[in-house]
């Protein structure tokens, strides 16, 4: 399934929403296998690839972030075997960096967020990222009282009895330690101890353990603490939770204090002031990795000064002041057997490489993305050469990588092994499904040619029509039980007019058409009286449907589930929405401006919606559909206790007590929506020195305006 995923840059918002739902469920399952059962099905690299895929989609479609997204939670729910422990401070995970460029961007982002010039004045620590089990050790009056796993980040498992058997973890702290101390770190099994344990298992004729990480985790969760004691587990301290007093004001100072208190800390941890120095140490640790007696999968960069950490704060699941720079994922060589072209619901022609099977990162790969025709030709998104201009041809020996994305990708070609007589791949200029012209649109604003070639057949194209119907009945749209992919394809291909479904309204006329038909659905293989009755009941149950589901089901390009909810909340009723979209047809005037002013609706999305409503075929389908179904009035959001919750805020001019990023993060944490432009939908404009046209427009519209001090007073500082 993963090999078939579309490149993120080619996804529509609807496709992105569908995949984010899949990734939320899939990553939750793997979290439970990894954290809860110590029995992972996939490698760490593949897990990181899934998470990175999720992050990339959310980065491109921020309005689609789900409440159950892996980016909004940490780890997995604790098991029922051990008593639950609620962490005094959440145990958050880290954002990942996958390249030197990502690491440099992290450093640059710190300076930018703090409003400082990148002058090398900010110190960062670098330390190996231990591949073990995260642990929180709580000391009260300098005695170890609780040891808990990370769990889901909020609630972990009480494994105190087992942790007491680990000799290098102090049971008591020295007199200078504060009354309440939570030390956080990683429990792991040394490679040498793991090898010795497996040697013992082999001598006894018992199954061998898979890897040190799983063995350490399983050893810690033994019901018999004597088993844990026999496994020679170890610990590195590197962070903290609740502290009744802070013994240092830097990250490095805290870790040095832990060492003085008797905790083992990693000797490779160092402090630097530039991205170049961070990366030099990263590559040094990477070279030393094979010689280390413990598994690591990257390094961690942290801002050293604790007061700067406090200013930088947190995202929903991770600190803004730290990142994990992962080591590169595995690459492999294989032969490109062919290139298939897939046609999606929006007509996008996507090339997929068919490969001789090869194992990459522990997974057998037979397909890989080729992104688009320019990528095949050796041209990047902005027109620059990639792979030094080397094109990809059928028959080539190619390099396949799984890193930073779920889809395996071809990253290069081995020119020395290119067979004689190969020819450059000719990307089709007609749809392989319906034969219609396939074109690359020109962006009216930039004048650039779209990287994606699209079929112009619209509903004439079977692939687009079928995929559109599948989208219409999908879970987040009309959610009609009994109309899955196979059933949609059957009804679409039927030659019987009483069975045929070619557009959405046909779904709701099926039962009426069948009443006078000689070809009864219940007599067709795969159906029966009971299943047909249930199908009709499911269809009729959807004759009244939420407005956001109705809008989402239309399959408008760039309009995913979250965008549909924004539109529904903004317009309230379909009558208002439909009339406004028709009125906005000239891409100007009040209706057009109102659409563009909705926070989360940019011009690209707005133009796609209006274009949809200008197409006569779409209007005919809509008219027929509205004869059969009734979109319900949208529910309006409930306000919270925050004085700015649900309000749209615009910051303009210079801010003197915080950076723009800090102000935005604070406003969003209080439930406000931050917009970049002023409109009738704006509630508050915060204006600092140098405020210009935005402040003028706010006054012209009679909006509430305030300066930075008034804003801070409103939100409580």
Curated annotation (Swiss-Prot):
NAD(+) binds at residues 44-48, 93-94, 127, 150, 186, 302, 326. It catalyses: NAD(+) + (deoxyribonucleotide)n-3'-hydroxyl + 5'-phospho-(deoxyribonucleotide)m = (deoxyribonucleotide)n+m + AMP + beta-nicotinamide D-nucleotide. One of its GO terms (biological process) is DNA repair. This is DNA ligase. Keywords: DNA damage, DNA repair, DNA replication, Ligase, Magnesium, Manganese, Metal-binding, NAD, Zinc. GO terms for molecular function: DNA binding; DNA ligase (NAD+) activity; metal ion binding. Its EC number is 6.5.1.2. Pfam families: BRCT, DNA_ligase_aden, DNA_ligase_OB, HHH_2. One of its GO terms (cellular component) is cytosol. Its cofactor is Mg(2+); Mn(2+). It comes from Sinorhizobium medicae (strain WSM419). Residues 639-717 form the BRCT domain.
């Amino acid at each position: 399934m993963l090999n078939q995923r579309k490149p993120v840059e080619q996804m529509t918002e609807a496709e992105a929403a569908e995949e984010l739902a899949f990734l939320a469920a899939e990553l939750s399952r793997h979290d439970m296998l990894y954290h809860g059962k110590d029995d992972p099905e996939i490698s760490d690299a593949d897990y990181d690839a899934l998470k990175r895929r999720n992050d990339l989609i959310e980065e491109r479609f921020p309005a689609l972030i789900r409440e159950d997204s892996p980016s909004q939670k940490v780890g997995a729910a604790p098991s029922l075997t051990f008593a639950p422990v609620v962490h005094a401070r959440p145990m958050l995970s880290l954002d990942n960096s996958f390249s030197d460029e990502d690491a440099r961007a992290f450093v640059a982002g710190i300076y930018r967020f703090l409003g400082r010039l990148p002058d090398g004045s900010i110190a960062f620590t670098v330390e190996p990222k231990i591949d073990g089990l995260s642990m929180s050790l709580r000391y009260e009056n300098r005695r170890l009282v609780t040891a808990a796993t990370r769990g889901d980040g909020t609630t972990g498992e009480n494994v105190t009895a087992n942790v007491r058997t680990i000799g290098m973890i102090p049971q008591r702290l020295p007199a200078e330690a504060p009354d309440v101390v939570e030390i956080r770190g990683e429990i792991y099994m040394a490679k040498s101890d793991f090898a010795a344990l497996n040697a013992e298992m082999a001598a006894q004729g018992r199954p061998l353990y898979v890897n040190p990480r799983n063995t350490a985790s399983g050893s810690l969760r033994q019901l018999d603490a004597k088993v844990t004691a026999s496994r020679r587990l170890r610990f590195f301290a590197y962070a903290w939770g609740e502290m009744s007093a802070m013994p240092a004001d830097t990250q490095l100072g805290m870790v040095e204090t832990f060492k003085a208190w008797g905790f083992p800390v990693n000797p490779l941890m160092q402090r630097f002031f530039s991205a170049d120095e961070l990366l030099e140490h990263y590559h040094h640790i990477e070279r030393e990795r094979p010689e280390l007696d413990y598994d690591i999968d990257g390094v961690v960069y942290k801002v050293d000064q604790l007061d700067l950490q406090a200013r930088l704060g947190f995202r929903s699941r991770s600190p803004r002041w730290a990142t994990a720079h992962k080591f590169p994922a595995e690459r492999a060589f294989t032969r490109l057997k062919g290139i298939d072209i897939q046609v999606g619901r929006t007509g996008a022609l996507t090339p997929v490489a068919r490969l001789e099977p090869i194992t990459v990162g522990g997974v057998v790969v037979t397909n890989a993305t080729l992104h688009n025709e320019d990528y095949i030709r050796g041209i990047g998104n902005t027109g620059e050469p990639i792979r030094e201009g080397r094109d990809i041809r059928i028959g080539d020996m190619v390099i396949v990588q799984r890193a930073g994305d779920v889809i395996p990708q071809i990253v290069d070609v081995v020119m020395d092994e290119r067979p004689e007589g190969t020819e450059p791949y000719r990307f089709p200029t007609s749809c392989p499904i319906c034969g219609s012209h396939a074109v690359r649109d020109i962006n009216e604003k930039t004048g650039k040619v779209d990287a994606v070639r699209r079929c112009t057949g619209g509903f004439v194209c079977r692939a687009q029509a079928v995929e559109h119907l599948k989208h219409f009945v999908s879970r987040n749209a009309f959610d009609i039980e009994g109309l899955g992919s196979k059933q949609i394809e059957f009804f679409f291909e039927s030659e019987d007019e009483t069975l045929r479904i070619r557009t959405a309204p046909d779904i709701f006329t099926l039962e009426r058409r069948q009443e006078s038909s000689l070809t009864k659905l219940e007599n067709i293989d795969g159906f029966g009286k009971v299943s047909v009755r249930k199908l009709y009941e499911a269809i009729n149950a959807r004759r009244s449907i939420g407005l956001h589901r109705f809008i989402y089901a239309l399959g408008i390009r760039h309009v995913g589930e979250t965008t549909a909810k924004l539109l529904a909340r903004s317009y309230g009723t379909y009558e208002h929405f439909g009339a406004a979209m028709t009125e906005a047809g000239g891409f100007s005037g009040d209706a057009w401006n109102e659409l563009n002013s909705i926070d989360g609706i940019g011009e690209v999305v707005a133009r796609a919606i209006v274009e949809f409503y200008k197409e006569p075929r779409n209007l005919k389908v809509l008219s027929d559909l509205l004869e059969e179904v009734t979109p319900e009035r949208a529910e309006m959001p409930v306000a919270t206790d925050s004085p700015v919750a649900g309000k749209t805020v615009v910051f303009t001019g210079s801010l003197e007590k915080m950076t723009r990023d800090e102000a935005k993060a604070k406003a969003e944490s209080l439930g406000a929506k931050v917009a970049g432009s002023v409109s009738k939908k704006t509630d508050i404009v915060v204006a600092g020195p140098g405020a210009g046209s935005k402040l003028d427009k706010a006054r012209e519209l009679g909006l509430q305006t305030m300066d930075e001090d008034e804003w801070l007073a409103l939100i409580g500082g």
